[in-house]
Design a protein with these regions (language model features):
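Short, conserved beta-strand element in jelly-roll/cupin
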Residues: 50-65
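A short, N-terminal "cap"/entry segment at the start of jelly-roll beta-barrel domains
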Residues: 1-48, 115-118
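Ligand-binding loop in jelly-roll beta-barrel domains
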Residues: 84-110
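Short strand-coil-strand connectors
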Residues: 32, 66-70, 93
């Protein structure tokens, strides 16, 4: 018998089907500090800085991520990273934008050791 806390497949179709009416995101899995949601962001919306590091995995659509004094374009298949405490928002996005939003790590962010480029 499998243990869903040890391994799991999260299906896009199931996440989309579980999205509550009139909602733009739904949590699909949580384990320890890991928190995964399916989201259909509506810009322009300034995101409040989060207490954990955050990854966006772009499933479809494209747009701009405004973060840390920068504007970076993104497209489906891209992965975006925003460190804990950084203000950010999406702009100029296509109507079909859909993504996985992943929070992880300790509150305050996961700090790379000094001397590394990660």
């Amino acid at each position: 018998m499998s243990n869903p806390d040890r391994s799991r497949v999260i299906r896009l179709a199931e996440a989309q089907a579980s999205l509550p009416a009139n909602e733009r995101s739904v949590q699909v899995w949580q384990r320890g500090s890991l928190d995964v949601a399916f989201a259909l962001p509506v810009p322009p919306k300034q995101q409040a800085p989060h207490s954990q590091d955050e990854i966006y995995i772009i499933l479809r659509g494209r747009g701009m991520l405004v973060h840390d004094g920068r504007r970076d374009s993104f497209d489906s298949g891209d992965i975006l990273f925003v460190a804990a405490g950084i203000e950010h928002r999406f702009e100029d996005v296509t109507e079909d934008l859909a993504l996985w939003r992943v929070f992880y790590g300790p509150h305050g962010g996961d700090v790379a050791p000094v001397g590394t480029s990660s």
